[in-house]
């Protein structure tokens, strides 16, 4: 009897799995956005040569969504840093401007070096994935992604570091 009562209380007081209590978080919406973006993303993947050529076009923004520290330690020449954790409608508008502007993205997992500042992340959690989904979700659909693994020591990459002020 006591077991039945405890089980009934646990069931009655457990939150429903699908129920979102926070009206500012929409996990189901994020899952749908991810499904919607999946096929679109497949057509937006670039080789290094395509990425580099696209990066030379007027108005094209090379967006590095890694942390400010990682960006300062090294990034592709011409890239602009807006850390993924700082993505908001306002910060994206300031950094990108026009929602039709061509955007190129890359992340740690595009580099074979696997050392600071581009330690390889878990492949399912590669920053490119979240960055792509979020940019499209915020209305910046003209985004393309580097889909090649390169060595940042290769001169063609144009890897630069930001000098640390002393």
Please describe what each predicted stretch is:
Residues 1-7:
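Sec-dependent signal peptide recognition
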Residues 7-17:
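Hydrophobic h-region of N-terminal signal peptides that target proteins for export
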Residues 8, 41, 61:
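Short, flexible active-site loop motifs that bind/organize anionic cofactors or intermediates
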Residues 16-43, 72-76, 80-81, 87-166:
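Rhodanese-like catalytic fold shared by cysteine-dependent sulfurtransferases
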Residues 40-54:
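A short, well-structured juxtamembrane/interface segment
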Residues 56-58, 99-100:
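Residue-level preference for short coil/turn positions at secondary-structure junctions
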Residues 61-66, 79-82:
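Short hydrophobic beta-strand that contains or immediately precedes a catalytic carboxylate
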